[in-house]
C-alpha cells in the first residue's frame, strides 16, 4: 500500500490497525506534525509495556496533558503517520528495489519487509514495523511519538496507558452497587456506568 500511495501522489500515509480505538482528533493531531515519521503510543495487550521502543537511555515518559514529542528507536505501526518524503528517502538511501513489476499489478517497494539485525552478540529478527523503523533510522530519519495522543488497544478489554504503568488489581470477590433507576444508562449488567 505504501508503494501505491507513492505512485498515486499521496503526500502521507496513516497506518491504523483494526484493533485501535481513538478519538478522531488524534488523526488531525498526528497529521499536524512536521516530522516525517510520527507514531502514537499504545500498550501491548496483556503486558506492561508499550508496543514501540524508546531511544536509550529513556527512563521516563510523560503521557497525555504533560506529554509531547519524543524520539523512538522503533515505532509500532498500529497508529503511524509517514510522509511521502520519508518513503523516498528510505528507498534511495537503502537502495530498495521496485519489485513485482513483471506481474502487471502495482509494484512493491519492500519498506516493511522483515529483516534480521545483529543485536548484543546475537541476532534479532524484526517484524515489519520495526524493520521499517530500522530502515528509516539507517537512512538518517528520526522517528517520533506524540505522547499526548490517547490510544486504546483492543484485546480482552481496551488496554491503555494505565496498563503500562500499573498492575490491574484483581480481587477474589467484589460488591457492585446496582441501580434500579431505569432512566440512567447502565452497562447492560445492571451495574452503574461510571461517570
Which residues does each PLM region occupy?
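Short beta-strand-to-loop acidic/aromatic patch adjacent to the donor-nucleotide binding site
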Residues: 9-21
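Active-site charged/polar residues at nucleotide-handling catalytic sites that mediate phosphoryl
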Residues: 8-9, 33
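C-terminal catalytic/acceptor-binding lobe
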Residues: 94-195
Amino acid at each position: 500500500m505504501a508503494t501505491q500511495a507513492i505512485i498515486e501522489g499521496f503526500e502521507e500515509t496513516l497506518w491504523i490497525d483494526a484493533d485501535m480505538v481513538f478519538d478522531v482528533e488524534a488523526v488531525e493531531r498526528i497529521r499536524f506534525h512536521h516530522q516525517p515519521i510520527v507514531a502514537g503510543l499504545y500498550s501491548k495487550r496483556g503486558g506492561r509495556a508499550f508496543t514501540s521502543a524508546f531511544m536509550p537511555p529513556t527512563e521516563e515518559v510523560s503521557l497525555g496533558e504533560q506529554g509531547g514529542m519524543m524520539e523512538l528507536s522503533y515505532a509500532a505501526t498500529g497508529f503511524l503517520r509517514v510522509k511521502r518524503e520519508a518513503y523516498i528517502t528510505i528507498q534511495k538511501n537503502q537502495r530498495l528495489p521496485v519489485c513485482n513489476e513483471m506481474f502487471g499489478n502495482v509494484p512493491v517497494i519492500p519498506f516493511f519487509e522483515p529483516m534480521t539485525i545483529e543485536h548484543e552478540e546475537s541476532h534479532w529478527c524484526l517484524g515489519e514495523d520495526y524493520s521499517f523503523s530500522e530502515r528509516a533510522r539507517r537512512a538518517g530519519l528520526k522517528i517520533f511519538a506524540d505522547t499526548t495522543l490517547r490510544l486504546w488497544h483492543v484485546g480482552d478489554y481496551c488496554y491503555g496507558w494505565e496498563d503500562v504503568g500499573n498492575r490491574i488489581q484483581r480481587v477474589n470477590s467484589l460488591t457492585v452497587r446496582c441501580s434500579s433507576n431505569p432512566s440512567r444508562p447502565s452497562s447492560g449488567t445492571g451495574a452503574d456506568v461510571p461517570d
